[in-house]
C-alpha cells in the first residue's frame, strides 16, 4: 500500500476507533459510568448488563490503540519533512505508548473487575454489600486515575509534541496547528473533569471530537490535489 494511502487510512481509522466507543458509551452504558448516578444504580446496571458493559470497554481499548496509531503514523510520515523535528516526534510516540499502556490497564479493570463486583453486590446482603461497595469505590478510583488521569496527561504531552513538530514544517497550515493545540488542551482539560461526573461526558466528548477533527484536517490536507501537498505524505523515492 502506498505510504500516502496508508497514512490516510491509519488516521481515519484512529478517529473512528475513538468515536465508536464514545457513541456506544453514550447510547448504551452511560448508566454504569460515574455520570450514571450513585453506586447502587451503577452496580445494578452493570450486573444486569455485564456483556454490554465489558464490550464497551473493549471498544475503548480499541480507541487507545487508535490514538497510539495516530501518533505513530504522524511520526513515521512527517519525521523526514523539511523543518520537522524527528526527536520531538519520537518522544511523542514514547509518551503515547506509555499513556496507552496505562489506559489499557484502566480499561481492563473495567472489563473484568466491575462486572464481578456488580454481581457480588446484587447477590449479597449486608454487611457483604457494604464491603463490595467499598471495593468498587477503590477500583473505580484506580481505573479512573489510570485511564483518565495518567493516560490523558501523557496523551496531552504526546499531542503537544506532535503539534510543535508539525508547526515547524515550513508551509504546514497554521489553522491545523491551532486546531491541534485546542484539541490537546481539551484533552488536558478532560483530565480533572473526569472526577466531576456532571461535566465528564461533555469534556471527554469535546476532546475526542476535536482530536478527530484535527486528524481529519491532516488527512484532507494530505489529500490535496497539488502534488506539492501530496508529496509530503509520500516517501522520497530514489532517483535514477
State each model region's role:
Residues 1-240:
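Hydrophobic, aromatic-enriched alpha-helical segments typical of multi-pass transmembrane helices
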